[in-house]
């Protein structure tokens, strides 16, 4: 009786492939949401909802409730979109899948900041570069030398490649478009409440752990993809693999060390968060050319990951 609903929520392989292509094209054409599109974006609405549910003095149980309430309410909206579009027309259903892909995997937006910041640095506009990078990282970059500014930029690119593209793509293959959205929402909630502050330490625990769990395998797969794709960006596969083996566990984060060390080794640069960690410490700080190369490396790794994802979708169709 509900077989149609299963096909609507987890489409056939050809629809998954077409939806992925549509979503990536939408991302290239319209990378940054503004106005009403931004206000209705699930990353924005879930972030606001989670913060509004925070209660002073609440513990881990309420933190789990924040995650469940926020995730389930958003998933219901997009599940309804998939179901309704499926009943109307196959083309509309494919478009709905593509829209969810676009909302869940903002690849171009993740890359643009690093490219712009590196170009500003190349032009000698260090303060402009600093302001751009400050917009994507939490650490205070005021007074930091350009090398540490570009380090923060490359680190953010490496982490965002996992959080914003390869991880949701992994769950897209496994669970369909709602799987990609689940990962993106979970990552957003970690960014909203997953902090070790007196107010959020207990309430954010569940969101932080959920994000760590969901990204555990994709982070490691992505590090391997970065190493394999390194020659496409003029970087070093061997250097990347060596740095992963040597430095991936230096960070407090269970996952972030893998893509960051993969980038550091591939580019042969020192990536540092002052007072917290130094990755590939024997190498020089990155310059603007390294920032541009990091963007090319991210594109190369994402492209390789996408090709393998498409192959997995095709093999799934053949198995079916």
Curated annotation (Swiss-Prot):
GO terms for cellular component: plasma membrane. GO terms for molecular function: ABC-type vitamin B12 transporter activity; threonine-phosphate decarboxylase activity. HAMAP family: CobD_CbiB. It is found in: Cell membrane. Converts cobyric acid to cobinamide by the addition of aminopropanol on the F carboxylic group. It comes from Aeropyrum pernix (strain ATCC 700893 / DSM 11879 / JCM 9820 / NBRC 100138 / K1). Pathway: Cofactor biosynthesis; adenosylcobalamin biosynthesis. Keywords: Cell membrane, Cobalamin biosynthesis, Membrane, Transmembrane, Transmembrane helix. PANTHER family: COBALAMIN BIOSYNTHESIS PROTEIN CBIB. The gene is cobD. Belongs to the CobD/CbiB family. InterPro entries: Cobalamin_biosynth_CobD/CbiB. Coiled coil: none annotated. GO terms for biological process: cobalamin biosynthetic process. It holds the Pfam family CobD_Cbib. The chain crosses the membrane at residues 8-28, 57-77, 81-101, 161-181, 221-241, 297-317. This is Probable cobalamin biosynthesis protein CobD. It comes from the Archaea. It is a multi-pass membrane protein.
